[in-house]
Swiss-Prot record:
Residues 40-65 are periplasmic. Interacts with PhoQ. InterPro entries: SafA (IPR031411). The chain crosses the membrane at residues 19-39. It comes from Escherichia coli (strain UTI89 / UPEC). Keywords: Cell inner membrane, Cell membrane, Membrane, Signal-anchor, Stress response, Transmembrane, Transmembrane helix. This is Two-component-system connector protein SafA. It is found in: Cell inner membrane. Induction: By acid stress, via the EvgS/EvgA system.
């Protein structure tokens, strides 16, 4: 009986850790998206177009090397 109780508590703790990990990941992704959209808003459309073009050239050149 005691072993079952200990096993259940370990399982509950593992589930808690998984849930907390998911929450942390979701919060970090949310903050990252907020930062990205804030930067896009501050830079404006013309700057983003130039950055996207430069990034595209960089990716293509990296793939060709």
């Amino acid at each position: 009986m005691h072993a079952t109780t200990v096993k259940n508590k370990i399982t509950q703790r593992d589930n808690y850790k998984e849930i907390m990990s998911v929450i942390v990941v979701v919060l970090l992704l949310t903050l990252t998206l907020i930062a990205i959209f804030s930067a896009i808003d501050q830079l404006g459309i013309s700057e983003m177009g130039r950055m996207a073009r430069d990034l595209t050239h960089f990716i293509i050149n990296s793939l060709l090397d």
